[in-house]
């Protein structure tokens, strides 16, 4: 097996591990205690240790924390601006979902966290997020800061050829729905359409208007 084949195999394995890790982090509880039961993909509700405190650098150059960024329901995605297709497609989908939600009266923030510390400087991120959505918040940071955020969200990335200015980066592609008070609510895979994401997020936001006790999701806020 050559180097590229080994890298692809490792990336595929890691992608499976990420999905399994997210699933393992979700604890099912009875429907009757969960006001979000009708919104979730599974048969139970989720109290998940996904998300948590982070310190990163915004596209404005300011140092920010999760409390500064996730001030309203947010769609959080990990990627990189030099990504040839996956990241632009997923980010466009998230931006379209946010626009649909705005038409329905819901204010949701799309957040793009870069896993490419070397190339995704604040100005580069600004150019990328401006193309996606004026609402999108771009975040980068040192490798250590990015690693901490990736770990908190049970995400994954692998820089194939460190030092190569044209290197590709393998990474997980789930989008996380986060609430500033409750933390993690659900996640969306790449096959979810803007309409599917908007319908799901809208369900959660409508349910948030209904008083009830749903287990907090461990985002550290």
UniProtKB/Swiss-Prot annotation:
It comes from Rhodobacter capsulatus (strain ATCC BAA-309 / NBRC 16581 / SB1003). Involved in both aerobic respiration and photosynthesis gene expression. Belongs to the SCO1/2 family. One of its GO terms (molecular function) is metal ion binding. Residues 45-210 form the Thioredoxin domain. Keywords: Copper, Metal-binding, Photosynthesis. The keyword Mitochondrion does not apply. GO terms for biological process: photosynthesis; positive regulation of cytochrome-c oxidase activity. It comes from the Bacteria. InterPro entries: SCO1/SenC, Thioredoxin-like_sf, Thioredoxin_domain. SUPFAM superfamilies: Thioredoxin-like. Gene3D superfamilies: Glutaredoxin (3.40.30.10). This is Protein SenC. PANTHER family: ELECTRON TRANSPORT PROTIN SCO1/SENC FAMILY MEMBER, LINALOOL DEHYDRATASE_ISOMERASE DOMAIN-CONTAINING PROTEIN. Pfam families: SCO1-SenC. CDD domains: SCO. Cu cation binds at residues 83, 87, 171. The keyword GTP-binding does not apply.
């Amino acid at each position: 097996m050559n180097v590229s084949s080994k890298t692809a195999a490792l990336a595929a394995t890691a992608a499976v591990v990420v999905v399994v890790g997210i699933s393992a982090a979700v604890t099912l509880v009875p429907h009757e205690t969960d006001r979000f039961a009708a919104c979730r993909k599974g048969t139970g509700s989720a109290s998940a240790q996904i998300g948590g405190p982070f310190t990163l650098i915004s596209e404005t150059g300011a140092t920010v924390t999760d409390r500064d960024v996730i001030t309203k329901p947010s769609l959080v995605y990990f990627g990189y601006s030099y990504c040839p297709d996956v990241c632009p497609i997923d980010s466009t989908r998230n931006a379209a979902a946010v626009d649909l939600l705005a038409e329905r009266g819901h204010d949701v923030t799309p957040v793009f966290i870069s896993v490419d510390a070397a190339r995704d400087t604040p100005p580069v991120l600004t150019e990328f997020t401006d193309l996606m959505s004026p609402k999108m918040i771009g975040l980068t940071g040192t490798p250590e800061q990015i690693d901490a955020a990736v770990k908190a969200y049970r995400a994954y990335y692998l820089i194939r050829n460190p030092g190569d200015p044209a290197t590709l980066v393998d990474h997980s592609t789930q989008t996380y729905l986060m609430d500033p008070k409750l933390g993690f609510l659900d996640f969306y895979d790449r096959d979810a359409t803007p309409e599917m994401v908007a319908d799901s997020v809208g369900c959660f936001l409508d349910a948030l208007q209904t008083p009830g006790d749903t287990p907090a999701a461990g985002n550290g806020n």
